[in-house]
Amino acid sequence: MEYEVLSPWSEVDTSVLTGLTPRLDTLEGKTIGMYGDFMALATKMLHVVEEELTRRYPGIRFSYLQYEEETSEIAKDTAFRPKFEQWLGGVDAVLSFYGSVPSGALFLGYNSALMEQLGKPTVMLTVPRTYPTAIRGCKAKGVPGLRTVQYDVAVDKINSHVTLEEVRTAMATDLPGLTDALVSALT
């Protein structure tokens, strides 16, 4: 008998690579999609980012969506996909959080790549330890250059026990990177 062995980390079929959607020229007056993965901390982080961006851009608006499936692709979820597409149609760009565990980071990469492929400038936030896995997810779906900001969680607790104040303190240094990733020209 002869067997063929396949690796989930195999080479990407580059015939389906997708270029990045142009960034926004400003955040003023725009609606930002706030996408959170299944972790409770993702929603806390998104709310902190909303508070800060609202201070800087008074006309900015936000629309939230959380996908509570840890290891599922929105593209293949026939029950959730219509809700996702309706939400995505109402935003100008997406901040996609947060990929704190490897399995979640891989699927955050898959789902963030889908947002970019559907024409929305997307910025994905991950922690350094899961960044390579999240990027593999993006590459596997044909968006190898997805803009990503790494967030080094300064609090070593179970996600659900992190307070909003701890998130505010940690996110203060990362907000400029998120803003730049949404509006800076592609290089």
What residues fall within each predicted segment?
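Metallocofactor- and cofactor-centric catalytic cores in central/energy metabolism, strongly enriched
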Residues: M1-L118, T126, Y131-K141, T148-R168, ...
